[in-house]
Amino acid sequence: MFFHAILVLIQVALALGASPRAGSSERSKYFVTSLPGMYSNLPKEEIPIMFSGQLELFPENNTHYYFWKFVNPNPIAEAERRTIFWLNGGPGCSSMDGALMEAGPFRVNDDKEIVYNNGSWHKAGDIVFVDQPAGTGFSYSDEYEHELPDVSVHFLKFLEKYFEVFPEDRQNQIFFAGESYAGQYIPYIADGILKRNKNLKAGESPYDLRGLLIGNGWIAPNEQSLSYVQYALQAGFVSPSMPGWSRLLASQERCQNVVNSVNTQDDSVSDYKVVSDVCDQVLNTLLEVARDRDAPADQQCVNMYDYTLRDEFPSCGMNWPPDLVNVKPFLNIPGVQSQLNLVHKKPWLECSGRVGRNFVAQRSKPAVHLLPSLLEDVPILLFNGNRDIICNYIGTEAFIKELEWNGQKGWDDDNVFDWNFDGNLAGYVRNSRNLTFVNVFNSSHMVPFDLPDTSRSLMDLVTGNFDIKDDKILTYKLGTRGQAKQSDKKPASTSSIPSEISATALASGSSSASAQASATANEADGDNNTSHKIERAIQLLVIIVLLWGIYALYSSYKSRPSSIIKSGPTGKKKNVQWADQLRRFQEDDQVRVQPHGIFAKALNKFKGNSDGAYAPVQGRYEDIEMSSASPIDDFVVVSDDEEEEPSRNEPSSNQK
């Protein structure tokens, strides 16, 4: 065990010594060297280099964003010089869902220890999970964000601070990935980056933004709400013969009237904000109509995040995914919070009710309005798990059909291409003019939760790391593309594929800003390398001496005679308490503790009230990343520092 730990420390030391620029000493306080189960459950070669902590953004209002960065110590060539920023949704749901249940290298077992996720995205590039807006997860502030433009401004500030700590990442290709309400966050952040790149201040260099990946995104909420009835009929869990069918159609018609009155291409802010309460009600009505009152109590409602699963009514998916019952207590272990370098320790809640209630998005236009301008410069990949109801693939394809970008409306043609991953059919792909859509088969609202290895290959579709054969798009397990027989494969090229399905089309960063970013960053990097050789050598020498000293001390300790009378442990027992583990959407006011050709169905949606949060069904359903918002009266403040956590079936204002 000791030598295992030393090996990890050496890997971290080499990572530091590789580029001792200005940020190196600063970032040392963010190292993560141990977590429960790390040395006993993970192969030593799979232990990532990790950095974690709370970065100060605005001292005037005490705003700090929490991040957890994972680096592959042995990266393959195709994954080098990449940084992926991952965001979960809500608003107000922690990206630790993504880190510990989806795209990160760890899962949490029943013993509250980490185990390895073989499909981790950190093998496709360094990945950084960020809790935002302020107040989400381990992030904190004295003030809350209210609008989507705030998200953009504050995240650009986070990037500024992040690159001060990790200057070697500044030249990397940047990708954003996330799901659910991140379908609003990511376009706004990308828009802010592109505007920054075009208006650089003295001494600034552009960020090399290369692609956006949005899974089960809540991008055009009202238009997507119109897909529920069609999806449910196709999936077979409702029919016109059901009681309440006419009520469902009436709800659908009211939403259609809203959509007809709002031009999604209109650049002005809609009276309906990001989502209309009228359209928000369609899903609530659908789940009520689909309820099977003759089934056992825990099987009466279809799971809104995976229609093949059942749940109790009115939860309808709030008790999913099952991993959450381990993730929450794990992140609330005091020792784990210390190992993650939390200066301001706080109870971890999956979703913050206070953030959701404050994030009203009342003056924000839906992110779908930003896609046309973004697609002029940046490739965007939208992917949907085909079993998701709340943000289903039918709704995504419907708003794309009505979208006008790069001089044309909708897709160039009707061609659909099968996507094969590792020799098996994984879904289908459509692509035109920098926009790619992927329907991922056999997956839910959280695609990486169900199919981690397959989901990681979505990065290959964005970066052009694929082949074409018989009008099929072929991707492979990490690093194995070169092993495939090339004689019977056609390389991805514009001329070989209709509908612009090609490596060039999918991976192109057509923006001159991206090219400029690469050139500028590389030039700056070249100037730094020579001047730091001596510093690197000295730093590595010091690290080696320190490690040798630790080894010598350990050897001396092991070799000395031991007494037959051994003292027992004297450490204090730490008592940790947390609320009902199945509660999906809890109030984060508890946070202010001590300073602390084939069809399927898919995608998750966030529900919202007049305050801008997406509410659960009947005002009582909590969405994983889009729960419904309850009236403020539902949240009773017990004290200035702690807000009462609602019981499992009470309404909540957050989603994941």
Swiss-Prot record:
GO terms for biological process: apoptotic process; proteolysis. Residues 1-17 form the signal peptide. The keyword Transmembrane applies. The keyword Lipid biosynthesis does not apply. Residues 558-656 are cytoplasmic. It is found in: Golgi apparatus, trans-Golgi network membrane. It catalyses: Preferential release of a C-terminal arginine or lysine residue. It is a single-pass type I membrane protein. It comes from the Eukaryota. Pfam families: Peptidase_S10 (PF00450). GO terms for cellular component: membrane; trans-Golgi network. The chain crosses the membrane at residues 537-557. Residues 626-656 are annotated as: Disordered. Its EC number is 3.4.16.6. This is Pheromone-processing carboxypeptidase KEX1. It comes from Meyerozyma guilliermondii (strain ATCC 6260 / CBS 566 / DSM 6381 / JCM 1539 / NBRC 10279 / NRRL Y-324).
